[in-house]
Amino acid sequence: MGKRARARGKVDKLRAPESEYADPDGNVLVLRGAMSPLTRHRYKSILHDQSKLTDDSWQRATEFLFERLVVRWVVFDVPTEGQKELLARYRIASQEERRWIRDTLRAHLTEHFPDLETP
């Protein structure tokens, strides 16, 4: 089968809906609106991990949600995309940025995933 025949038979992949959240400084966080059942299960187990301190579980759960839900993060007009780049940027974020991200993730979970507990 040639390239063109393969391209004709190509079906567009389904994409999860995305939501944009902006802070007062104009920074934007774009989050996915869907999570697989396995991702939901993993999140719950991380959030309630009895072998870790509550604060450790809470921070790990927030990072887990960040990894799974964030599609793009624009900070001072500099876009960051891709899981590795986003996670690296998150790990060097200021306390204020992390607080905003945590609050945004909480609002997003409440709106799109009411069955999940917020970190």
Which sequence ranges carry the predicted segments?
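Short acidic-hydrophobic surface loop/beta-edge motif
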Residues: A16-G26
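Short Lys/Arg-rich cationic patches that frequently serve as NLS/NoLS or arginine-rich RNA/DNA-binding motifs
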Residues: M1-L14, H41-S45
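A general secondary-structure signal for short beta-strands and their flanking turns/coil
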Residues: L14-A16, E63
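Short, surface-exposed, charged amphipathic helix/loop patches that serve as local interaction elements
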Residues: R32-P119
